[in-house]
């Protein structure tokens, strides 16, 4: 995990649409989440995003634009979902950053 990112940092997640039939005028939704822990091989565990009280399930392989609100400032990166699971009452996903 990047040394500028800390456990507990708030993040915004935006899905990257890869379909050719996506309407370019459609505004993409931004979802809030939080960094929970470091994962293996520089991955990280984050909470599954919630919007209007509902969990937004993101598929394994889904590419994302991620904005980190850290103590060192705003950081943006592309990421991919490499796993998802439930731990207790929390729905989590493991993401891997694609850009530094």
Feature names for model-found ranges:
Residues 1-100:
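Structured alpha-helical
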